[in-house]
């Protein structure tokens, strides 16, 4: 009788263990998909590169491509996607402040130097007085573009404006440039219609623009605008996110960036 009870008890324990394992397995299966929003290049290209590595960890990486700088942050905050990969910290922080969001960076990966391009002029000195210069209209990238122009002594900004400078903060403009504030994604399309445009690397690349070859003025490689993987606060320790961080900062990714972008259009920072 004691043996029967013992066997019954062991069977119950075994069944409980199997049941628990099944529950864990289901939970793991439910959480195995990781959805990350990204702009096409280089972000989506990098994510697609590491998808097989995450698959080995039991994680299916789903890459959702966006062509603007607003929707991917809305999607992370609302929980529609798990993370995004397209922005730098100053932009993320300004977005949090403006919308009351709770976005945080989990890892920095690379810098995409900003550059001034022109279809009409071949040298910076050729840009005439009164020229129209298109710049990004989002808070941090607009300030970043103006700081780039200031670095070449084309304009002077009020030092109090900092990274969020706008054309209203220009205190000296000897050549009387006219600034056209345009959504960053649209800048390559309007390049032919203006005298010059300051374009973010992730939009310049798909448009066939090479910063080193085509840029009249290029941001230094020591730029503080490192691109990051962003999640909603509280999700930093999600095992899927940790696996993504490990994969996206691997030697494989570093070599991919150096090989695919040998002209410094994208510079790894890890």
What would you call each of these model-derived segments?
Residues 1-33, 269:
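Short, low-complexity disordered leader/linker segments with a strong preference
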Residues 30-41, 59-65, 132-133:
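Short, well-ordered beta-strand elements
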Residues 41, 67-69, 79, 83-93, ...:
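Beta->alpha turn/N-cap motifs
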Residues 63-74, 161-189:
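Short helix-initiation/N-cap motifs at beta->coil->alpha
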Residues 94-106, 120-121, 193, 198, ...:
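Ligand-binding "clamshell"
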Residues 106-155, 254:
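A conserved helix-loop-strand patch within extracytoplasmic ligand-binding domains
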Residues 113-124, 226-238:
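A bilobed periplasmic-binding-protein/Venus flytrap-type ligand-binding module shared by bacterial periplasmic
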Residues 141-150, 248-268:
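Periplasmic-binding protein-like
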């Amino acid at each position: 009788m004691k043996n029967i009870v013992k066997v019954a008890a062991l069977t119950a324990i075994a069944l409980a263990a199997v049941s628990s394992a099944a529950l864990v397995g289901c939970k793991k299966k439910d959480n195995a998909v990781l959805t990350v929003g990204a702009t096409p290049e280089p972000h989506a290209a990098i994510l697609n590169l590491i998808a097989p590595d995450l698959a080995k960890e039991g994680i299916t990486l789903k890459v959702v491509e966006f062509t603007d700088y607003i929707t991917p942050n809305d999607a992370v905050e609302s929980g529609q996607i798990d993370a995004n990969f397209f922005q730098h910290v100053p932009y993320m922080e300004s977005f949090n402040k403006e919308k009351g969001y709770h976005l945080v960076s989990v890892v920095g990966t690379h810098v995409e130097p900003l550059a001034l391009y022109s279809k009409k002029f071949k040298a910076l000195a050729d840009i005439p007085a009164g020229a129209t210069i298109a710049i990004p209209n989002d808070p941090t990238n607009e300030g970043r573009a103006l700081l780039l122009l200031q670095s070449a002594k084309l304009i002077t900004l009020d030092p109090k404006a900092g990274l969020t400078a706008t054309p209203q903060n220009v205190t000296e403009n000897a050549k009387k440039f006219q600034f056209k504030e345009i959504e960053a994604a649209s800048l390559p399309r309007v390049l032919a219609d203006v005298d010059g445009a300051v374009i973010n690397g992730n939009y310049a690349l798909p448009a066939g623009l090479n910063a080193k070859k085509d840029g009249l003025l290029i941001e230094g490689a020591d730029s503080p605008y490192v691109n990051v993987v962003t999640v909603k606060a509280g999700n930093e320790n999600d095992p899927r996110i940790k696996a993504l961080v490990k994969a996206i900062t691997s030697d494989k990714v570093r070599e991919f960036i150096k090989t695919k972008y040998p002209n410094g259009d994208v510079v790894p920072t890890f």
